[in-house]
């Protein structure tokens, strides 16, 4: 009994949660305490039905766990019962997330917490409310404002952030002049850059899939993009990845992070990202009179009606005609 008292006093000095200290004083262990930490671990286990899914959900939850630890502290995250997590705790996490990510990103991240807690409530037959339900998030759902197009002036200013590295420059110019997704460019093979036809061939590779079937397409290249791609592909095998450092699982994410790090040295507005170059291409095509069907073919959206109507060879010329107005 004396030993338990001494241990209890020692733990109390370490500022452990009172319920843990009380268990030590009593000499009796209570039923397993369900905490935010165990909720997250159980959720990862529940969602990890394949190795790929396990890796993705683990990375997502780990980032979220770090945010929660920053707000709640390690002790609260690991030892405080889920029953003692309050609505104010949920609001505190929401406010922290909104200080560093967009409203819609915060919604997605808080959705993981809410779903994980719902899973724990069902699996452990807990009779408690989910305090992360129906959190008010100002600005959520305003998807049209989440990612704004970059202006021509901003694009010119951005050139300085990429021009000192041939890889970064080739990626930037291709994204700027094609409107392709970052993953589509990052996952190219050398042979996908057809300098004779002056186009990119966007197709699946061993290290990168495509978002949709309609993403499989050919896209005209600007003279500046051709020059940048020739420089970066020099001496490489046609079957080899054009950007070997990104020819791996989640390579597109790594590429995007590198490009975003450079972009943020010039532009700090969170609504402007590398994807804003894609929005810019879409807007400029529309503003120069490009028909919607041709714009969709260039960007890999919808059904590729251009190829069906004109034939694939002529479709490339049709797309180039409209893209040249954007490049001018």
Label each region the model flagged.
Residues 1-37, 45-53, 58-60:
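N-terminal helical hairpins
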Residues 83-84, 126-129, 139-158, 209-223, ...:
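DNA breakage-rejoining catalytic core of tyrosine-based enzymes
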Residues 103, 107-111, 126, 131-182, ...:
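Basic, Lys/Arg- and aromatic-enriched nucleic-acid-binding interface segment
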Residues 187-231:
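Conserved tyrosine-mediated DNA breakage-rejoining catalytic core shared by Y-recombinases
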Residues 192-199, 290-310:
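Short, polar N-cap/turn motifs at the start of nucleic acid-interacting alpha helices
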């Amino acid at each position: 009994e004396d030993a338990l008292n001494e241990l209890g006093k020692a733990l109390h000095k370490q500022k452990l949660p009172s319920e843990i200290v009380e268990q030590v004083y009593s000499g009796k262990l209570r039923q397993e305490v369900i905490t935010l930490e165990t909720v997250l671990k159980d959720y990862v286990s529940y969602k990890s039905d394949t190795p790929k899914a396990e890796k993705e959900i683990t990375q997502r939850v780990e980032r979220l766990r770090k945010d929660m630890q920053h707000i709640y502290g390690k002790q609260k995250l690991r030892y405080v019962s889920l029953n003692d997590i309050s609505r104010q705790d949920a609001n505190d996490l929401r406010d922290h997330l909104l200080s560093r990510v967009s409203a819609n990103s915060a919604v997605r991240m808080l959705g993981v917490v809410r779903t994980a807690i719902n899973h724990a409530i069902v699996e452990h037959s807990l009779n408690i409310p989910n305090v992360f339900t129906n959190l008010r998030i100002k600005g959520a759902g305003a998807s049209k404002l989440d990612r704004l197009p970059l202006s021509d002036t901003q694009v010119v200013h951005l050139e300085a952030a990429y021009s000192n590295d041939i890889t970064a420059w080739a990626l930037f110019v291709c994204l700027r002049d094609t409107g392709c997704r970052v993953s589509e460019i990052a996952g190219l093979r050398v042979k996908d850059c057809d300098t004779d036809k002056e186009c990119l061939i966007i197709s699946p590779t061993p290290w990168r899939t495509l978002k949709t079937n309609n993403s499989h397409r050919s896209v005209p290249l600007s003279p500046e993009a051709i020059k940048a791609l020739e420089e970066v592909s020099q001496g490489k095998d046609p079957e080899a990845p054009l950007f070997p450092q990104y020819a791996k699982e989640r390579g597109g994410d790594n590429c995007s992070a590198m490009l975003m790090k450079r972009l943020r040295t010039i532009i700090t507005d969170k609504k402007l990202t590398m994807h804003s170059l894609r929005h810019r291409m879409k807007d400029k095509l529309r503003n120069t009179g490009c028909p919607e069907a041709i714009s969709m073919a260039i960007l890999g959206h919808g059904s590729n009606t251009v190829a069906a109507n004109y034939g694939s060879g002529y479709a490339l010329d049709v797309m180039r005609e409209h893209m040249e107005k954007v490049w001018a």
